[in-house]
Amino acid sequence: MLIAQVCDFGNDGDARYRVHDPSRALGGLPGVTAVDCHFLSRFLPELIERADVLVLQFVMDWEMTGVCLRRRAAGKVTVFEANDYFFDLQPWNPIAGPWQDPAVQELYLQLLKLADGVQTSTPELARRWKRLGARNVAVFPNQLTSVPELSPAPQDRPLTIGWAGSPGHLADLYHLAPCLQGWLDAHPDVHLAVMTTEAARPFFNLPPDHYHFETFGSLDSYLQFLRRLDIGLAPLLPTDYNRCRSDVKFLEYASQGVVGIFADLEPYRESVGYKKTGLLYRDSPDLIAHLEGLRTDRDLRLALRQQGHAYVRRNRVLSNHIASRLSWYQGLLPKHDSNSSLPAEIAAHAVRDGGYLRLPPQEPERGLRDVMSTSAPAQASPALARLLEQSPQYLSALQHQGRLLNDLRQHRQALEVLERSRAIQPQSARTLAEIGRAWYRLNDDARALAALDHAITFNPHYLPAWQYLLRMLSVNQDADGPRRAEEAAKIFPTCYPVALLSVAAYPRERAPSIILEVLDRFGSSLDSNSRPAALSAFREAVLATVKAIPDSPELLPLLARASELFPESPRLVAAYGAALIAAGRDREGWEQHRRALALFRGATVAQDEFQNERTTPLPWELASHILKAGGE
């Protein structure tokens, strides 16, 4: 069996536990070849066609929706790995930007439904994914590849408590910092060690020789850090994101002989045996009581240390569980005798370890990645042209070059490049959508419509093609616009950008009632993370409608609802005030204008105080997050 995984390459915990370690273990099973392939690899199209099982690791590529459909028709299996609850990300988290993009969230919702199977890390995540329409959900908990022998408990150092975590978990530590600081002040014989991002260093004020701090690094450096600890903390605020996290910190602590005190939430309730393999706490006093008990009872520390290590070594080693993953894959396949072979060219370029192969970014992929990080098309396109001279069949590079040339309004050249792409993969919705865009810019609506229709026929779930099509139909006031808008709404029912884009496809006089319906449908689901982008999109749609049909009687209820849902927008509030005044409700209108003035003055003060700063101060974000979660 050929199993290919589309992924990025990393050396942190997630990369090891969820991506590379399982692939390596699968490749060690008889009759299995497992390949980790970078998402920009020039060999990916071939692997997509050949692999019996294709695993998608949070890839932000709408083309993968069509891959699911195409592979199912060919009797092959596509699995979506979804091991984080991406609807509740912390705003300061480095990955918050892309994951909070409504288009990315919609992509993941589509993949949950379109994939033949969804694999995840916890029962809580599996429950949520099933509720969102996922089929055949399997839980594969994180496992360790090995557990070292338990070394003797250190006796020649001060008792050390500690924590290590990624930036996304800063609030989990921050909300406990005051009570921990007080306990540490009361026990100067106890030391603290922390490993995370530099922003957390000031959370504690301790003498330098009592406080070890280091910035986060690789998984190996993290495991080395854990050997400093006697007691490890695992705080979690009761957020949706945290409830869906795995118990991997218990595995890491126990494997290194660290006694853990864990938040009494879903990730740890099943795996941590209370007072057998670790301790669970419900609030700050509970945590402090456990710390005090472990500080004064060395025998308890040693017992938990030994029992936790023994449990993990006996029950949580990957080699003892990997066969169940293979069995699940086999059960998804229409027939069990699938045995696709790996092309010789791919094998020759891969880094091989028995049945496990790695295709990390090589020279062409690194070149494309650099080009994609260049914001100016005028600089990126010539660099990509040079890369394509060396790798003329590199599909992702050809497609990106076609898009860049369209951005530069060099549409004839774009078509030449995109036709080369189509020759390699005729059913690529990405290629066809860019061809449609080029023809539209060349004023050939018939060819543009044909290309976009082909893209949607081959892959009805390719959102960018729908966006191009709806814009084109709206600009042309095409009579078919409303029908296509309704079709898009059925495919993307939870995507407000599609709903707003569809408004212009209808007759202009219907816009207020349609936007009002969209506001009612989506307004209650917006949280603090999604509001900024939603406010911008809805404000633009509402104010464009006010400008287009200023005398419509339906504007007043629309503006009332918009300013109710987005009371922080001075422009929406001001527009509502103007509409009230126009309707003869002067005093109510003046009240709204007074509100708008206060909002404007507040924004002016903030702009004056913060000048060019675009990042919210971290303590503010952490405090807001803690209070929202119900932290103490």
Q: In which residue ranges do the predicted regions lie?
A:
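A charged, aromatic-enriched C-terminal amphipathic alpha-helix characteristic of glycosyltransferases
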Residues: D299-Q330, P334-H336, T494
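Nucleotide-sugar-dependent
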Residues: G168-A171, L219-D220, Q224-S255, I261-V272
